[in-house]
Design a protein with these regions (language model features):
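PLP-dependent amino-acid enzyme catalytic core
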Residues: 1-315
Length: 315
């Protein structure tokens, strides 16, 4: 029987898990860390999952008509995922983002057919959100999917990412580590894993200089993709056992090291999750545990950032 996907969105999910033997040895760990590699999604990141989920949810609720306009304030991977899914499904997509975002980011979503509206960089994401709301008021039948509030976000991780992981490891998951942007991944996967085994420990990761999940003040940081500066509605603290705060340089170093050791080119938030996973794995009680870390995206989106500025930012 032919094994042919009907459309690209059918290839979202079912990402592989790989053992990080050399990286773990470099860090002096007794047992190798395991990584779920989300850049195997067609759009190159974990956000393909929620882009498809939020659009399908809007369709099922009847708020998104065929050919309608989707608007979303996003400067990152969610925009890429939405652009890919919108292209497949025939929706118009307008993404609002600060004008400080890289040319690569803008051109990447344009390549999928999305329209980009830039807002003043000094206004940050709040400016992009305000522009999205303005556009929604002007365009009949348009919708804003609101990834930081949309229940379809953690629900998709509960329905897919969590079960995939459980099956891939034959239920032998002791600790799960993931960064928190919207919190959808760690909350959805965490809920599923704890339903299978309440003893599984769920570790959330945020920037040290913006430790809001640990009750601290928001602040600037270099770890793109996590640390929104507020606690999202899509983050479920009830399934989280611990929040690890990671410094910028530790995230950058781990991201670089896993590329050199394992051939895994990842983004800076993956570096943060890796560093946190190493810290957890070094504890004596975790020496023989299966620790899984989720790597959200590819490093190709960060080649012009501090992550790969080897000459200007040596570590």
């Amino acid at each position: 029987m032919a094994n042919i996907a009907k459309q690209l969105t059918d290839l979202i999910g079912n990402t592989p898990v790989v053992e990080l033997g050399k990286f773990s040895a470099l860090k002096g760990l007794k047992k190798p860390l395991l990584a779920k590699v989300e850049y195997f999604n067609p759009g190159g990141s974990v956000k393909d999952r929620i882009a498809l989920a939020m659009i399908e949810d809007a369709e099922q609720r009847g708020v998104l008509a065929p050919g309608a306009t989707i608007i979303e304030p996003t400067s990152g991977n969610t925009g890429v995922g939405l652009a890919l899914v919108s292209a497949v499904k025939g929706y118009k997509l307008i993404l609002t983002m600060p004008d400080t975002m890289s040319i690569e980011r803008r051109n990447l979503v344009k390549a999928y057919g999305a329209e980009v509206r830039l807002t003043p960089g000094k206004d940050g994401m709040k400016g992009a959100i305000a522009e999205a709301e303005k556009l929604k008021a002007e365009i009949p039948g348009s919708v804003i999917l609101q990834q930081f509030e949309n229940k379809a976000n953690p629900a998709r991780h509960y329905a897919t990412t969590g079960p995939e992981l459980w099956k891939q490891l034959d239920g032998k998951v002791d600790v799960f580590v993931a960064g928190v942007g919207t919190g959808g991944t760690v909350s959805g996967v965490g809920k599923y894993l704890k339903e299978q085994n309440p003893d599984v420990r769920i570790v959330a990761v945020e920037p040290l200089s913006s430790p809001v999940l640990n009750g601290g003040q928001s602040g600037p940081h270099k770890i793109q993709g996590i640390g929104a500066g507020f606690v999202p509605q899509t983050y479920n603290a009830e399934v989280i056992d611990e929040v690890v705060d990671v410094a910028n340089d530790d995230a950058i170093l781990a991201g670089r090291e896993v590329g050199r050791q394992e051939g895994l080119l990842v983004g800076i938030s993956a570096g943060a999750a890796l560093h946190a996973a190493v810290e957890v794995a070094k504890r004596p009680e975790n020496a023989d545990k299966n620790i899984v870390v989720l790597l959200p995206d590819t490093g190709e989106r960060y080649l012009s950032t501090v992550l790969y500025a080897f000459d200007d930012y040596p570590l």
